[in-house]
């Protein structure tokens, strides 16, 4: 191919002029930046040709004049004037220019890239690229109408593609070539006669006719994405450049994928044999339209794609078979024309793998592959593996750091961000980072309070769609997650995973302080607050603080007197669902918690834990004032009230109690109620402990054993009273003579000796005294 002749280039070919109105609309720093670029262009041309005369524009700039021209004067002189100019600079220059930074004037950068908008209402437009290391590239536009001025000083081109459309030419500078013009006659606009390559480009071009011609070039460029030509530079910086072909990328991963094309490992090669591609669909999309090449047209829908070679790829979207590379993960599976959603279930038909079946998938045809479990169809076998793994439970992608497994590779990649600490998406309000864009979108709703997902049955709103789906299972009573070992079903998959850990006895999350294990990490975080004393949840009405949010919500019901959970049998109300569940065991008699040592069963788990401390002798709760220790925390709190003298529970008779249960027992003395009845002798008692002690008379059982003298007792109180005999201590001492006594009643009798105030006993006192005496004799001789 013969080299095109070199043509001269003048400063006017690369100069950009503004009208007076446009110049007045520019800001001061924008004017200075424009002057800086024009001077840089002139200095480069002077370095190539010392005899170049100084243009009038440069003289204006040097003398401090206003470098603008009037429209009519510029038409007479043949200069280029455009009412709407797109100015494209290199990424660093461009970002400083359009974001208000004046550092561009002092940055020392000399690269610039001007491009006249091909859709704007210009008298003439050109594509000018100025790079000191590559020379100057000038490209002529496609438009050729009566308003275009005479050709530039560089002279006519020797080759043209069509009448009135200039072809490629070599300018009179080393390494400078004219950019080939794109021919597109598919979407003409009758107003100006200009054609656009894509239909959406034509729509954007039509908007240019309705815009004000005096709109500032800077505003026009700020929306350059709407009219950007294929060769224009994006605003996002591309730091990673290919050393082979010079192509730039925003991310290093994209550059590495691109470099694989130069290694020759790909099975598909372009027409020039220069690059290889790993996917067949990537191969035709690499080629840009050449001069005279028309866009390819899709047979089913008539839509045109870029190169002719991509017709086959586009038909693959419509046909049920398609090439193997398309079926393996590069093709789109959405039915554009039929409205069929990706992955939706289509009706079963015959064999969908027949060769030559060109019925359009996007026009309502089926995909070639279907899932044997649920019948879900997919045009790609690789995509089909995803729904199948949902049924088989297969998770082939394993994390190298924590051995977690995933069904999809992309889920593994997102998970790996957690190990690397990488959270590329951050919230602007609170700075919290996220590994996925969708998680950031969900988090933003926390600040905005938006809850777009509404339950159709109860009207409750949710921030996330997953929360709505989980909530709807409450209405349908759906429990899709079943344990394969015991058959129990659960609403949530996380509940099933936690349940399965119980079968294996595995507790992967353990406390570093006490060694206690948990099945959930959130439970471990809640437990750590026990050691740290942290109570982050505060009541707004009484300033009480709580470790758990659920306890705070239950506490808030006490202020409103609201008890939303009520028993269906007795009507008793509760502030929490868990308390109602515990109460229902009273009616059903269920005791699911059994002690492994004595086989005793309990209604509540806390009761079992407290009981097990009897076997171990553990007393973890210590009074900070007198160092007494207790098995139950409630007993320790009641004991602390004795030190403070506080009696929060008082009876109408004025007597106070430290426990609510003691108040209830005391009230029965006023009412005469005896709810505990012996099933053998029909005798009734006020207290449950009295009933248990009485039942020992019928059974002869004496479960409480003295370790000193091997005596047995029916009641624990009798055993404790007896153990004082073996101790040398006399806790009750007389204040007058200092004599000590084991029992307080003995001290009271002794005090009467000193006061000589022994009244004659009445009949009631005699009976009470005799009963106490018989009980002591029975305890000592049994």
Swiss-Prot record:
**Cited PANTHER family:** C2H2-TYPE DOMAIN-CONTAINING PROTEIN (PTHR47772:SF11), ZINC FINGER PROTEIN 200 (PTHR47772)
This chain's source organism reads Homo sapiens
Q: What does this protein do?
A: May be involved in transcriptional regulation.
Annotated family: Belongs to the krueppel C2H2-type zinc-finger protein family.
One GO molecular function term? zinc ion binding
Q: Where is this region: Disordered?
A: 141-164, 285-364
SMART domains reported for this sequence: KRAB, ZnF_C2H2
Question: Which Gene Ontology biological process is one annotated for this entry?
Answer: regulation of transcription by RNA polymerase II
User: Which PROSITE patterns would you find in this protein's record?
Assistant: KRAB, ZINC_FINGER_C2H2_1, ZINC_FINGER_C2H2_2
Entry keywords, A to Z = DNA-binding, Metal-binding, Nucleus, Repeat, Transcription, Transcription regulation, Zinc, Zinc-finger
Protein name stated in the entry: Zinc finger protein 786
InterPro entries (alphabetical): C2H2-ZF_domain-containing, KRAB, KRAB_dom_sf, Znf_C2H2_sf, Znf_C2H2_type
Predominant location category? nucleus
Q: Map the zinc fingers (C2H2-type) to residue ranges.
A: 192-209, 240-262, 369-391, 397-419, 425-447, 453-475, 481-503, 509-531, 537-559, 565-587, 593-615, 621-643, 649-670, 676-698, 704-726, 732-754
KRAB domain location, by residue? 9-80
The record, for Pfam families, names: KRAB (PF01352), zf-C2H2 (PF00096)
User: Where in the cell?
Assistant: Nucleus
Provide a GO CC annotation, any one.
nucleus
